[in-house]
């Protein structure tokens, strides 16, 4: 959630930054400022009327004791009560409109984020490794998986519908091995605390990280219950400290968790229909950092390096891309994508997205810390995939494939199988 104080004091700055995402936000900001002004006037009027009512209520017993007529005061007190009630009803309507706009406004892009409309305007930062040159026509992961009988898309569809898969034998074991490998690297080498969290959360938890209300259509809701399946462990890990005030000496906090993730993939019709690249249910190891504001951008660079480490150990080529303003997620101030090389597509595909949300999520989730002087400040939160497990499986199957249609296991994983 953007800082209302910043919006009031420097609306041009807010509009300038949001314009780099989409010009349509400018009208929303103008309307938000209008409502805010109206809201503050009503609040001031209510406070003034309450003060008057309190003064007249104090006079009432004095006049009564003196035997004076109190009819006029009684009528005025009653009138004030009715006026306040009407103003409070009006204020509630205005508050609802204010929040309905505020909750849909994304984070302000950081100044060094490239300005652009979509993924075509993203900026490549670096590459690691060289794509393998095959002396045969490389197969796709789903061709390899079907031929080996380890990926079964028909049975996945029979059980659950489209974009679901059943894994057998080597695929199932490799999925499990990758999860354990990723968690071990992040906990033993990068200092993260491993966490196990629920996969079902309350709506206010999804509000805290920015999925609700804007992305309601991409979430799975439990019928007749006010619970949602998580689209990422970012939701649960970040909200571990919702409505809390942390001590400065307890920061930074690094959390990692493996969870299944659930997404309707609204708007993805026709994209990546074959294979396991885009599923309604998928496994992911998530990384979340809760840090002091002055540390957050250094922590973002570290976060990207920590996610990269997994691919380096697996010896799979990838590149790091800085997302432009038009391609960034709703809550992000700055995002790097890590894209892994997929031989069958002859291109890089996203396997991790690492973001600094600054205090955007912290404001929504009310996560603060107390400094040495006793003052409270919002933390900065960061999140990233470390990594998407299914996409890592794809990358291994394709980059390590052999002419006979099988594939090798990366050296670093052999102790996990």
Curated annotation (Swiss-Prot):
InterPro entries: aa-tRNA-synt_IIb, aa-tRNA-synth_II, aa-tRNA-synth_II/BPL/LPL, Ser-tRNA-ligase_type_1, Ser-tRNA-synth_1_N, SerRS_1_N_sf, SerRS_core, tRNA-bd_arm. The keyword Aminoacyl-tRNA synthetase applies. Keywords: Aminoacyl-tRNA synthetase, ATP-binding, Cytoplasm, Ligase, Nucleotide-binding, Protein biosynthesis. GO terms for biological process: selenocysteine biosynthetic process; seryl-tRNA aminoacylation. It catalyses: tRNA(Ser) + L-serine + ATP = L-seryl-tRNA(Ser) + AMP + diphosphate + H(+); tRNA(Sec) + L-serine + ATP = L-seryl-tRNA(Sec) + AMP + diphosphate + H(+). Its main location: cytoplasm. Pfam families: Seryl_tRNA_N, tRNA-synt_2b. GO terms for cellular component: cytoplasm. Pathway: Aminoacyl-tRNA biosynthesis; selenocysteinyl-tRNA(Sec) biosynthesis; L-seryl-tRNA(Sec) from L-serine and tRNA(Sec): step 1/1. The keyword ATP-binding applies. It is an enzyme of class 6 (ligase). SUPFAM superfamilies: Class II aaRS and biotin synthetases, tRNA-binding arm. L-serine binds at residues 232-234, 286, 385. It is found in: Cytoplasm. ATP binds at residues 263-265, 350-353. It comes from the Bacteria. GO terms for molecular function: ATP binding; serine-tRNA ligase activity. HAMAP family: Ser_tRNA_synth_type1. Belongs to the class-II aminoacyl-tRNA synthetase family. Type-1 seryl-tRNA synthetase subfamily. Catalyzes the attachment of serine to tRNA(Ser). Is also able to aminoacylate tRNA(Sec) with serine, to form the misacylated tRNA L-seryl-tRNA(Sec), which will be further converted into selenocysteinyl-tRNA(Sec). Homodimer. The tRNA molecule binds across the dimer. Consists of two distinct domains, a catalytic core and a N-terminal extension that is involved in tRNA binding. NCBIfam families: serS. This is Serine--tRNA ligase. It comes from Sulfurihydrogenibium sp. (strain YO3AOP1). The lineage of its organism: Bacteria, Pseudomonadati, Aquificota, Aquificia, Aquificales.
């Amino acid at each position: 959630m953007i800082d209302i104080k910043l919006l009031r004091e420097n609306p041009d700055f807010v509009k300038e930054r949001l314009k780099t995402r989409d010009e349509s936000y400018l009208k929303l900001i103008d309307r938000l400022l209008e409502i805010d002004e109206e809201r503050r006037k009503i609040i001031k009027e209510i406070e003034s009327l309450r003060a008057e009512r309190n003064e007249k209520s104090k006079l009432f017993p004095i006049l009564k004791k003196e035997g004076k007529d109190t009819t006029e005061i009684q009528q005025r007190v009653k009138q004030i009560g009715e006026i306040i009630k009407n103003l409070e009803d009006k204020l509630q309507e205005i508050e609802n409109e204010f929040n309905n706009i505020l909750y849909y406004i994304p984070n302000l892009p950081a100044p060094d984020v490239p300005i652009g409309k979509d993924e075509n305007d993203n900026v490549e930062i670096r590459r690691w490794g060289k794509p393998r040159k095959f002396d045969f026509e490389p197969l796709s992961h789903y061709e390899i998986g079907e031929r080996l009988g380890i990926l079964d898309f028909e049975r996945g569809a029979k059980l659950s519908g489209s974009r679901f898969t059943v894994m057998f034998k080597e695929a199932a074991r490799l999925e499990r091995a990758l999860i354990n490998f990723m968690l071990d690297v992040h906990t033993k080498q990068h200092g993260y605390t491993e966490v196990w969290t629920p996969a079902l959360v309350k709506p206010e938890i999804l509000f805290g990280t920015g999925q609700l209300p804007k992305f309601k259509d991409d979430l799975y809701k439990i019928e007749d219950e006010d619970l949602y399946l998580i689209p990422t462990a970012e939701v649960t890990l970040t909200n571990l400290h919702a409505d809390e005030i942390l001590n400065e000496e307890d920061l930074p906090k690094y959390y990692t968790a493996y969870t299944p993730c659930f997404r309707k993939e609204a708007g993805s019709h026709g994209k990546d229909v074959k294979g396991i690249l885009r599923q309604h249910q998928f496994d992911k190891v998530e990384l979340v950092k809760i840090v002091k504001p002055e540390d957050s951008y250094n922590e973002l660079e570290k976060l990207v390096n920590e996610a990269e480490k997994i691919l380096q150990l697996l010896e799979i080529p990838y590149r790091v891309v800085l997302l432009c303003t038009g391609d960034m997620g709703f809550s992000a101030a700055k995002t790097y994508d890590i894209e892994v090389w997929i031989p069958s597509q002859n291109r890089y595909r996203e396997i991790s997205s690492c973001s600094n949300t600054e205090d955007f999520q912290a404001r929504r989730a009310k996560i603060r810390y107390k400094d040495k002087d006793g003052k409270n400040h919002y933390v900065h939160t960061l999140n990233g995939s470390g990594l998407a497990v299914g996409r890592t499986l794809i990358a291994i199957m394709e980059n390590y494939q052999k002419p006979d249609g099988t594939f090798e296991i990366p050296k670093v994983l052999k102790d996990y199988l």
